[in-house]
Amino acid sequence: QNTDGGWAYNYNTRAGAHTDLSVTGWNVQALKAAEHGGIKPTKGDIRTALRKAAMYCRKCSKPDGLFTYMQEGREDATARPSLVGVGVLSLQMCGSGSDSAARKGLDWMLKNTNKPFNWKANNTSSNLYQHYYGVQAAMNRGGDVWTAYNRAFRDATLGAQASDGSFAPNGFPGPGGLVNSNGGTINDK
């Protein structure tokens, strides 16, 4: 973990390293799984790391509920719809799910993804990376948030499943093609 609270590819911890919300989200999930599994780190402690990660996630949040790839002031601080779910889920896993950034992110998700998921579209409505995290964040929140998000995503996704159980690459899978569409979809359920 870098001093800014985020993580970088290849676990680069030098000052000014390329930390981003995507890599940070993966590490938050790993730390939370380790915590639930009773695994104790050899250096530092999980709660401190999660507090720092929450701080980093807040630095990547925007007032409108979007999240940026990198924190403000870095080379890629562009707000991206695909990062809202990872930002909200990370804050939830860090114990900061009631933060303003998490609440605004959930509000953004409901306003902008509360429509039927379009499996074949080549836009953010079919971005499995976005929904991989968004489904988990909405489920963690529960209530009306989960009901609305699940309704928008579930039926279209189940309807896209082939008779052999696979999911064809959708309109916005990224470079992983069939592997991405199946792994991302299975994890979303």
Protein language model annotation of sequence segments:
Residues 1-155, 162-189:
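An alpha-helical repeat/solenoid feature that recognizes helix-turn-helix modules
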